[in-house]
Amino acid sequence: QENGYQTAIIGKWHLGTTPTGFDYSKVLINWGGQGTYFNPQFCINGKDTVTEIKRHCTQVIEDDCIDWLVNRDTTKPFMLMYQFKAPHRDWRPDSIYHDLFSDFDFPEPETFNDDYFGRLAASENMMEIENHLNRRDMKLIAPTGLSRRDSMRWLAYGDKGQFWTPYDSLNGVALKKWKYQKYIKDYLRCIRGVDRGVGRVLDYLEENGLAENTLVVYTSDQGFYLGEHGWFDKRWMYEESFKMPFLIKCPDLIKAGTVSKELVMNIDFGPTLLDFAGIKVPQNIQGKSFKNIFSDSSYIGRDAVYYHYYEFPIWHKVQPHYGMKTSKYKLIHFYYSMDEWELYDLETDPNEVNNIYNKVPGSLILSLKEQLKSLQSEYKD
């Protein structure tokens, strides 16, 4: 904004503060900032005025972003943060996608029936598709005649591992498989709506001669479990939630189809965007630009990335843990109500089911721990 860009954020914010640095902001505010899939509420430009629009949340955000692009000041460069609620829990797709994927079943992931052997923290989880998806997640309808409070309790049944089934004849393995299909199909139906919204913006850029000179980034705040390890949700340092999508399009500077396996962190996103815009990166910003990762074959990225999760026990009983990933290894320490270390060789065990912490030379453990301590010192954690 200080460098002449017209700036806007539309959609999910979820930080508990009013956005600053934007010429225009319209962010979700109900359900703790997550927003709801239907009848979402927004705060516009930090004012008390709340707008409720009776359409699907993805469609509202999509339409508002197109409107902003059409009506912006075209004499200025722009920066737009276009942020969807979908596919956050409880995965309620737009009605136009209700029948999508209804004619086939998705294959279950390789680790769908993981027994968590050798991984104490994982074995204590409360995010299993089999045991912890509730009635609301599966789109069941509460019985009539219940109070609002009792209706909410009825829908939440299953969160704590309580057994329930939609049909008396559906149980055991068949019930687990049924829950998975309902979950994955609703998740991907929500994603289809996001795909539509992203496509509309890309089409707008093409139709208005902006595609060649606009940097487009598609990313997320984390990955997600789609049945891997038998789970839904996120939080763990295991690959499926630890890794984030990061696709970038800038025809003038990046050759289509370029793929990099260099390690980067989300704190690098800001400096990278500033670098692409030709803006000096402030000294007090953590992270570093990886702009040259796409154009310089000699670019050397990070040799390790750091992670720390500390919320417990409210969210799915995921133990607080910190750790480090290199190109070959991942070292994790669960430290709150247990003292457990895990080490994975990502080259031979990409699914992270074989904890080798007690099976490798002590010299390797010592070296990795020293590297981990160095990262903690760097980030003052």
Regions found by a protein language model. Name each.
Residues 1-9, 19-20, 24-45, 377:
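Active-site segment of extracytoplasmic enzymes that catalyze sulfate/phosphate-ester chemistry
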Residues 3-8, 22-23, 73-80, 210-216, ...:
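Loop/turn elements at helix/coil->beta-strand transitions in domains of secreted/extracellular proteins
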Residues 21-24, 29-33, 50, 90, ...:
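C-terminal cap/loop subdomain of S1 sulfatases and analogous C-terminal strand-loop tails that border
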Residues 9, 18, 57, 61, ...:
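Stable alpha-helical elements in mature extracytoplasmic
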Residues 1-14, 52-54, 58-61, 67-68:
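Long, well-ordered early-domain segments
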Residues 1-5, 70-74, 203-206, 274-278, ...:
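Sec-exported extracytoplasmic/periplasmic mature domains
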Residues 349:
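Intrinsically disordered, low-complexity polar regions and short flexible loop motifs
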Residues 30-53, 70-75, 81-264, 276-284, ...:
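Active-site-proximal cap/lid insertion segments
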